[in-house]
Regions:
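Bacterial signal peptide processing site
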Residues: 25-27
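Structured C-terminal subdomain patch of bacterial secreted/periplasmic proteins
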Residues: 41-42, 134-144, 151, 155, ...
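Alpha-helical, coiled-coil/dimerization segments enriched in small aliphatic residues
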Residues: 68-71, 187-215
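Basic- and aromatic-lined ligand-binding clefts that recognize polyanionic substrates
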Residues: 36-57, 149-202
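C-terminal motif of bacterial Sec signal peptides marking the signal peptidase cleavage site
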Residues: 21-23
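Bacterial N-terminal signal peptides that target proteins for export
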Residues: 2-13
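A short, structured surface patch at a secondary-structure boundary
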Residues: 45-96, 100-105
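Proline-aspartate-enriched helix->loop->beta-strand connector
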Residues: 90-103, 120, 220-233
């Protein structure tokens, strides 16, 4: 158990460094196999979020990620597992002879070189925001002849956006600080992060803006000057442990007592099933939750 926790902490720290040093906001495509008929496509997916997309597009898989925290779509329950998202088993993937491996672009720095060396055809799927996710859905649908399904998904998405724009047009935007927790540490989510994007879609104003980065190191002395109305706390992994660490941080670090959000009991813990590192189709539930938090008193 101890080794598992230490391993999670190590992987989380590596992820922080990656997110702070690189901006994975584009799609990338590796060496592709010669085009075959759609029925011969052999697709592997290395994250649950991407598996949600392929499920909605009615695509079969020959390989899918392992997961301990999130639930795979039912149609993939008996599909060959290929290892965890940040460390897939390259030999298993090669043995399945994929025509394409789909991975989230946030893991590009971990996986691209491995895929290249193994001569595995790949595509990195941009899921840095809800809009980017739908653009990716359109591209995948075009590749596999599922445009009818992506068009319906796009229509539902645009209708939902209009609904939220209408709901919040006469309401005051709350100033929001978003903290993303990992075992042993936490970072601040900017407007470029998925959680930051979701906050803005729900009508909140993220107090932390950056032109490039999704996450930034925490500087509480600077954050207190921004004096957010609301503080949101979520996690990348190990949610229960991370939330306990957040509680300890807020109890023992006196600076948090100077935030109006803390004084007014406006600190909220979020479910990382809907508020994680990358966009997922669970964003609709996320919007509902944020709407309750932001506007329940208006």
């Amino acid at each position: 158990m101890k080794n598992k926790i230490l391993n999670n902490i190590f992987m989380s720290l590596v992820l922080i460094c990656t997110l702070l040093l690189t901006a994975c906001v584009d799609q990338y495509q590796g060496e592709k196999n010669k085009k075959t008929d759609i029925g011969e496509k052999r697709i592997i997916v290395t994250s649950v979020a991407v598996a949600q997309i392929t499920d909605l597009l009615d695509l079969d898989l020959v390989g899918v990620t392992d997961t301990t925290s999130f639930k795979l779509p039912k149609r993939y329950e008996n599909v060959q597992r290929v290892g965890m998202p940040m460390g897939p088993d390259i030999e298993i993937i090669r043995s399945l002879k994929p025509t394409e491996v789909l991975s989230p672009s946030s893991l590009k720095s971990y996986l691209e070189e491995q895929f290249k060396q193994a001569k595995i055809p790949y595509r990195f799927v941009n899921m840095s925001s809800v809009g980017a996710m739908y653009d990716s859905i359109d591209e995948i649908a075009k590749e596999y002849g599922k445009e009818d399904k992506s068009a319906k998904l796009r229509e539902e998405y645009e209708s939902l956006l209009k609904e939220y724009e209408q709901k919040r047009k006469d309401k005051k935007k709350p100033k929001v600080l978003i903290l993303m927790g990992l075992p042993g540490s936490f970072v601040v989510a900017t407007n470029n992060s998925y959680v930051g994007n979701l906050t803005e879609l729900a009508g909140g104003e993220n107090v932390i803006h950056d032109d490039n980065e999704e996450f930034l190191p925490v500087n509480t002395e600077e954050l207190v000057k921004l004096n957010p109305d609301i503080i949101l706390r979520t996690s990348h992994t190990m949610s229960e442990e991370v939330m306990e660490e957040f509680d300890e941080e807020f109890k023992t670090n006196d600076i948090w007592k100077h935030f109006d959000a803390v004084k007014n009991n406006k600190v909220y813990n979020l479910d990382n099933n809907y508020f994680g590192m990358t966009a997922t189709m669970g964003y609709k539930e996320g919007l509902k939750k944020l709407d309750e938090i932001f506007y329940k008193e208006q």
